[in-house]
Amino acid sequence: MAEALIRLEQVAVTLSGQSVLDNIQLSVRPGEIVTLIGPNGAGKTTLVRAVLGLLKPDSGTVWRKPKLRVGYMPQKLHVDQTLPLSVLRFLRLVPGVDRVAAQSALEEVGAEKVIDSPLQGISGGEMQRVLLARALLRKPELLVLDEPVQGVDVAGQAELYSLITRLRDRHQCGVLMVSHDLHLVMSTTDQVVCLNRHVCCSGHPEQVSHDPAFVELFGKNAQSLAIYHHHHDHAHDLHGAVVNDAPTASPPHTHVHGDSCKHG
């Protein structure tokens, strides 16, 4: 098995006296896609900051492969409407990038036609592809994608997930993908990690649903997607603490708990 690109061991973070992350164990290897899901306040943004080296944990370790090249795709980009910034000028903010390199990256994500467009004038789907192209310009060994389908319609989401899979296959980079409440998860995702300040559960996503309506909606892309049904045998209160009186209306489901879980 390939050596991990990044490995988090017993990572804990406290902000303003409140525990945000507790005993997090996580690793991403070359060619592996890890999808991180969880509700608002689960600590996903904090975890991404720790992975990127922007935040030092209060305890635990974040190990990175020496000289690891990371490409980061933010959830969204706010650009002042009065700022004269074209897609090309935006991409050239990455050191060493010229028009040829920018054009090549845009072609790789299927957005070459917008190279001279004002950044403020492109669609949500085009913006996500431009942000992905920018991440690729760093020739990353690890791609960190923060809600890459933000602001994209359902059909566009399928296309973007398919694109991310192809990029992983082509570059053999590791991918850490973050979602707020992801129902559509790629069938090629190697691991799904459910976070709510600690790792609630982790494992492989379920196989693609054969529901005719689902197949009809996604067409040829349907087979590259799966529906991940997110179930717990425990519940959290409003502060993220585990409570034992989880609803029992749904049948039990088997899943793997993280090492940090203090419940069965």
From Swiss-Prot:
Compartments in which it is found: Cell inner membrane
Presence of the UniProt keyword Nucleotide-binding in the record: yes
Bilayer topology annotation: Peripheral membrane protein
EC number: 7.2.2.20
Signal sequence interval, chain numbering: none
GO biological process per UniProt: response to zinc ion
Database matches in Gene3D superfamilies: P-loop containing nucleotide triphosphate hydrolases
UniProt keywords, alphabetically: ATP-binding, Cell inner membrane, Cell membrane, Ion transport, Membrane, Nucleotide-binding, Translocase, Transport, Zinc, Zinc transport
Domain ABC transporter: 6-221
Enzyme class, first EC level, given as a word: translocase
Sequence segments annotated as region (Disordered): 244-264
One GO MF term attached to the UniProt entry: ATP binding
Tagged with keyword ATP-binding: yes
Catalytic activity: Zn(2+)(out) + ATP(in) + H2O(in) = Zn(2+)(in) + ADP(in) + phosphate(in) + H(+)(in)
Positions of ATP binding: 38-45
Protein task: Part of the ABC transporter complex ZnuABC involved in zinc import. Responsible for energy coupling to the transport system.
Family note: Belongs to the ABC transporter superfamily. Zinc importer (TC 3.A.1.15.5) family.
Alphabetized NCBIfam families for the sequence: PRK09544.1
Assembly behavior: The complex is composed of two ATP-binding proteins (ZnuC), two transmembrane proteins (ZnuB) and a solute-binding protein (ZnuA).
Protein name per Swiss-Prot or TrEMBL: Zinc import ATP-binding protein ZnuC
Record organism: Pseudomonas syringae pv. tomato (strain ATCC BAA-871 / DC3000)
Gene designation per UniProt: znuC
